[in-house]
Amino acid sequence: MLSSRRISLAAATLLIGCLALSQHARTAMAQAGEAFPACDALAAIESADFGASIAIDNPWFPLIPGTQQVLQGFANRGGGELPHTVTFTVTDRTSIVDGVETVVVLDEDVNEGVLSEIELAFFAQDGEKNVWSFGEYPEEFDAETGGFIAPNVWFAGEGEGEPAQAGVLVPGDPSRGTRWHLQGWSADIDFLDCGQVFKMGQTLGNPNCANGVCKDVMVEKERSPLARQGGIQYKYYAPGVGLVQIGAVGDQENETLKLVARADIRGTAEWDRVLAEVDRLYDNACDRGFDLLCP
């Protein structure tokens, strides 16, 4: 582990290699054929750096409770490229993860009209407006049992061996060409994601942006060095809106999505449904032994 004093994203990128990662992760990266380092580690967090952690107003990734975004496109989940929809809803629920209060987001994946995965995701913002990912509780449909299972859960600060680490999903002051940085890591589930700002100042057409045009778009590349056949995802973030498009190169799933709807759903039946789903997932997680989500 690095020092418990958290440093800024800019300073963190000066670290050599993934020093905070275990030998297990380094070995896995080498076996995957990736040149070390895969991404620069970030120092361990300090809760004091997250004084207003749930007021997430990062220009490129604002998380305002009640906001629901729907992205539609195609993805290959083993049966060819099929219609795929992701619904991303910022709730008013919060949870303490690794000593930091986080915003809870409900993420629902639907393939050909059938729910394939439903997830609680946990985000927080530091004093420099970097938005951190602190963990995920996903339930995935299991064709063998006809039910949902949860094999890929991770929370920062938790783990049977080395504790998982939070990472920066969207930087607060992005600049093109910065080094690959850690987005999240868990040895328990062989999870490691890295991100890099690829382009700035891009323009995209989308009806959910002012006058149908998204300006000053940031493009971030994401990859998983542990995936033997993993490619690169490109995520497009528009100021004041958030994620507006996803593309992929060399990725098996070849997920391509565009934002088709964005609304404040508070006070609606859909809002009630979302909160009921969140409560249900909390109960499931607690029943499965993830005490962090127990009352």
Question: Whereabouts are the PLM-identified features?
Answer:
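Bacterial N-terminal signal peptides that target proteins for export
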Residues: M1-A11
